[in-house]
């Protein structure tokens, strides 16, 4: 088992039995990250100009072309914003828990750029730990059991969402390996 996961599981297990000390700085940062996520999803202006982001690489090409050409598409379902917000909040909690577990995060939420065939692609990776880039993903129990729990090779073989390419672009852009 990976050392990072062991540290996280140890903290979480201990917290079920006793009070754990978490610094006020970590708690305050978690609160700020949650406020930022809420504002981002509900109150910030949306960029109307099309651009490919590293996180959208897994979308079907025809969908990206329609977005670029401003073709009308169906509105996302009413619960779409909640799913995206939950992902942001889980990410904030995961980072706070990693810090509380004593994991040294070298950088977080860092914007990176890459150029492919003359097209500038932006992205924001989640965390850098031990000079490696990691991307935090939230998943339903089904997705976890059937995709992520089976390891990286399983994700690589059936990567409908472009996670492997996304991680590779973060890695290439930062000059650091993908964890």
Model-derived segments and their meaning:
Residues 92-101, 155-179:
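Metal-dependent nuclease catalytic cores in nucleic-acid-processing enzymes
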């Amino acid at each position: 088992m990976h050392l990072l996961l062991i540290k996280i599981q140890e903290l979480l297990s201990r917290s079920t039995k006793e009070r754990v000390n978490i610094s006020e700085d970590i708690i305050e940062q978690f609160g700020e990250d949650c406020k930022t996520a809420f504002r981002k999803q509900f109150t910030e202006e949306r960029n109307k100009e099309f651009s490919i982001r590293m996180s959208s690489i897994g979308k079907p090409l025809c969908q990206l072309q329609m977005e670029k050409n401003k073709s009308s598409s169906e509105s996302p379902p009413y619960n779409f914003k909640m799913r995206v917000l939950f992902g942001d909040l889980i990410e904030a909690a995961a980072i706070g828990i990693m810090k509380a577990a004593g994991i040294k995060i070298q950088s977080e939420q860092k914007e990176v750029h890459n150029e492919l065939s003359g097209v500038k692609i932006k992205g924001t990776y989640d965390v850098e730990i031990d000079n490696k880039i990691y991307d935090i993903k939230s998943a339903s129990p089904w997705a976890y059991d059937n995709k992520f729990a089976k390891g990286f090779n399983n994700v690589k073989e059936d990567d409908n969402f472009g996670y492997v390419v996304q991680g590779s672009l973060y890695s290439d852009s930062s000059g650091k390996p993908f964890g």
